[in-house]
Amino acid sequence: MTEKFIISLTKKSERRLDKLILENCPPNLSLSRTKIQDLIKQKMIFDPQKQNALTLKTKTDDLMQVILYSDQYLQRTLMPEDLDVPIVFEDNALIVFNKPSNMVVHPVKSAQRGTLVNFLIYKFQDTLPITYDRFRPGIVHRLDKDTSGLIIVAKTKLSASSLIKQFKSRKIKKVYLALCIGNPLENLNKIIGKRGINMLEDNILEAKTNIRRNKINREMMEVCANNGRLAISRFTVQAVYDLGKNQKLSLVSCEIETGRTHQIRVHAKLIECPIVGDNLYKLRRKEDVDVKKTISPLLDGKRSRQMLHAHELSINHPESGKTLFFRGILPYDFSNLLSNLGKFKTS
């Protein structure tokens, strides 16, 4: 398959998108219905009028053409995409979003579409400054795919430079909310002796360790003694939920001084209170399995994801120097779960 094909939908006997494309597909493409379905799922088939990726549920009545793109094309081209990303603040220098979960910040090999950058290209075209590479226009920091919450995008070169410096010099205050399995304040006898864990004033639990990529599973990060990068997280318990049968959850706020990959998730596991829904950094304990079963009905059928939300950000404005404070509203899945847990709250 070459990089780009335009298919005119002249035959309209089939209305479902995959069948309609198959019926109108030129023989030289040699596309099966299964392959077409895969392309749709990978967001590689578009409406040329709206420049939106199509889905199997797309209404085809008024659809006249579709465009098929290859992997090679998408890897070299940032495609605009109109997505629902709530804006918290915007001026001439920067824009702050409340990123949904299940959204990658910038295109990677496994996610070419549906990223925040695809939306930035749709909204700003090519006006944003290039920061680290051309696939990250305006991006000065990032969040994991399944982490929701506040993310800042620079709109000018001056703003990008200032914000990147603030992140590197640790001048930006970042506070997350996480729903964790267990209560770290009840584990102090077990965890305080571990390397890098200390109890500070006001019941703040600090994890100060080096972190590096796991040599066996490259998707994971791990605490290490040497050769890693310093990561500092401070946990404060905000609420405790007693589910019975030795099952507890805690809502914790976590202020991070550094911004390492998976930092909070790694440190939550280190203090033996992994984040609910985090399958990468879970502990293999019976109580963790039991908690997962107990809260499953409280999710209202929603997909379980790591309950981690970038809740607060405080920065110095790149132009005025004025301190700006932002708070990101909890998404429905997180707030609804907390609401359903309310009857179990003990503190």
Regions found by a protein language model. Name each.
Residues 2-347:
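RNA pseudouridine synthases
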